[in-house]
Amino acid sequence: MTQPPVYLDHAATTPVRPEVLEAMLPYLTAQTFGNPSSAHRFGRAARAGLEQARREVARAVGAEPTQVVFTSGGTEADNLGIVGAAMAARERGGTLCAVVSAIEHKAILAAAHAVCRLGGREVVLPVDGAGRVDLDALDAALAERPAVVSIMWVNNEVGVVQPIGEIAGRCCQAGVAFHTDAVQALGKVPMDLTTLDCTLATVSGHKIGAPKGIGALVVRDRKAIAAIIHGGSQQYGLRPGTENVAGAVALGRAATLATAEREAEAVRLCALRDELAARLRAGVPDLVVNGEGSERAPHILSIAVPGADSEALLMHLDLAGVAASSGSACSTGAVEPSHVLVAMGLPRELALGAIRLSLGHDSSPDDVARVAEVMPAVVAKVRKLAGVLGRV
């Protein structure tokens, strides 16, 4: 009997949880389909659902409901946070400069590039071998009074957790807006914005069991950003357009579940991750665990296999019934290593053999056992193929 496939790519996206689907479905049907800006009963019903969702997201992250601005996802929220902060600074006569780390999500790096296209500049902070941001470099950048600093809470490729409280505090002391991409943090690490000097924070639904196409930017100071799209007056004019009510309801429910279950899930996922790492090392002794020397979120395991190509590893894992992902990107026909691993100082040859295994709500010990069982044969096959092709 064929075994069901194993999904270990939860950092890319997650299945919609049944409770979340149940909560959002009424807002896609004749019950409460109205436009939340309409004054009639259909609109009022939709508005009630939207505002309840706003309250749920706020409770999950430690914010006020009025600070939650719904977006189409993490990428839009990141752009609103960075480009919006830069534009607001320019309107105040400030410095048009965005400071980011070298291991940010591509959405953050692209938004910083967009600030350059507006006539500003970007500063990219280095990280150490464990993926931690260089705080001395941060202090030097803050001395130039940039418009915004953006440092992700949990890295999406290796799971490294930044000292976000210290970083936010330094930005606040310097009078600089601080944004964090918390997409991989929500539901995985303790998150309470009331304890942080954080101006802006991004969250996304499809990483925690809600559907794709919904996220939020938590805006704790509306003066810190300017709108980057233009239209109606929805959401204080910061994000015009008719809100995705069903998506917002889904995000609210998913965020509530994720935070309620976080402590127990963190223990469970951390145990699964460590068991997976140990069993993989037993089968592939020279395997490298990336970011191992730093605090990591419980759901992400980044490994590098010497003498192997990540794309080949992923293809053969898929054939063996295991879904994982790579941090590398194909550009102009050439595979380049992950910018995150390169920034952390991993040799190019090793970085080209890196893959990410990410756990989620439905991951089980059986999944770990299955991956550990198939990995040695997959690695041997890929290494043999690389030798035949003259790549090692």
Regions found by a protein language model. Name each.
Residues 1-392:
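Pyridoxal 5′-phosphate
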